[in-house]
Design a protein with these regions (language model features):
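N-terminal Rossmann-fold NAD(P) dinucleotide-binding loop
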Residues: 158-159
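Rossmann-like dinucleotide-binding domain for NAD(H)/NADP(H)
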Residues: 91, 229-231, 235-329
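Conserved beta-strand positions in the Rossmann-like core of class I SAM-dependent methyltransferases
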Residues: 173
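Phosphate-binding beta-alpha-beta segment of Rossmann-like dinucleotide-binding domains, i.e.
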Residues: 87, 95-148, 163
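An N-terminal-biased, well-structured beta-alpha scaffold segment characteristic
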Residues: 1-92, 219
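A short, aliphatic-rich alpha-helical micro-motif
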Residues: 36-41, 60-63, 144, 196-201, ...
């Protein structure tokens, strides 16, 4: 059974994965639509990264042999899943496989920004030991204990943050349209609406999908309601935040800082955050969920699901676009 993978073979070898003999994986670097369409000829499935590159309607409509699409992350915005649904192609993701890795990133980012760690390291390497120490002493480092952490989204990743935040002595509030009553009660998570979350929490960490209701949700008005010492952590999707508004808020000193694991400009010169001092903003290249352990779990789950569909003729697990096709021959 031919599976076209837009993940490199190295991802499997680095994770210690042995490719199953029942599947014939063909690895394709991201080379554009026409190359992808040609390579997908006779393939039964696509194995995709969670966010990039994007497989659009143009490609999907020209891949008649594709029966199943599997992403390797909680996100599934690397594919036009609505068009896939119209074509009867199920799209599955990998829920909860990297939740602990992302949660660890969130806590590390908070501590880094509250204490200016990455900035101080850079300043010392530029010969500014005394000056950087004086600046940090004047600004005053913040202690995480006693802070209120606000989670916008209380799914698998948001829930993984809760015990870590509690271990640091923080209280936790959250906003989620699908409120997990039992989990929240058992773990002492306070329910807030989005306006309360941004206005009342010391840290707001985004853990929501990118969809019509969340795109550009975090704008200037919402950001300007945050406390002056507050932090914004975005390890979700760049489109949730109006980046020009966040850059303006940071430049004006309206909040203490932000950690961005995803942003639209991908580090190019026009990225508005590159001109903001590292003391105020931490930029990382979408690696919050990228650990060897997480990749191993995601890839193992993805391969099991591919075998389930293509080899055993069973319906896929973790379908995100509502397509439940019959795979029995």
């Amino acid at each position: 059974m031919k599976v076209l993978s837009l993940l490199p073979r190295s991802r499997f070898t680095e994770s210690g994965m042995t490719l199953p003999e029942t599947l014939s994986l063909h690895f394709l670097p991201p080379n554009g639509s026409h190359v992808l369409i040609a390579a997908a000829e006779s393939a039964q499935a696509l194995l995709l990264p969670p966010s990039q590159p994007y497989v659009d309607a143009f490609c999907l409509e020209r891949m008649p042999s594709i029966r199943f699409i599997r992403t390797t992350g909680a996100g599934f915005d690397s594919v036009d899943h609505l068009t896939a649904a119209e074509l009867g192609i199920p799209v599955s993701n990998s829920p909860n496989m990297n939740a602990s890795s992302v949660a660890e990133y969130v806590m590390a980012a908070i501590v880094n920004l509250q204490r200016g760690l990455a900035w101080a390291d850079g300043e010392i390497r530029r010969g500014r030991y005394a000056a950087s120490r004086a600046e940090l002493l004047e600004q005053g480092g913040l202690e995480l204990r006693g802070c209120r952490i606000g989670l916008f989204g209380l799914g698998n990743i948001g829930r993984a943050v809760v015990p870590l935040a509690k271990a640091f002595g923080c209280s936790v509030a959250a906003c989620d349209a699908f409120w997990p009553e039992e989990f929240a009660a058992e773990n002492g998570v306070e329910r807030m609406d989005v306006a309360e979350l941004f206005a009342e929490c010391d840290v707001v960490s985004l853990h929501c999908p990118l969809n019509g209701s969340t795109r550009n949700l975090v704008d200037y008005n919402l950001l300007s309601s945050m406390k002056p010492h507050a932090l914004l952590i975005n390890a979700a999707r760049s489109g949730v935040v109006v980046e020009a508004d966040l850059a303006r808020i940071l430049a004006e000193g309206r909040i203490r800082g932000a950690a961005l694991d995803c942003f639209a400009d991908d580090g190019r010169a026009e990225n508005p955050f590159l001109s903001i001092p590292a003391e105020r903003v931490l930029l990382t290249p979408h690696l919050a969920g990228v650990t060897r352990a997480a990749f191993g779990r995601m890839l193992s789950q993805a391969l099991e699901n591919l075998e389930r569909v293509l080899v055993h003729g069973q319906p896929p697990r973790f379908v995100v676009n509502g397509v439940l096709a019959d795979y029995s021959d």
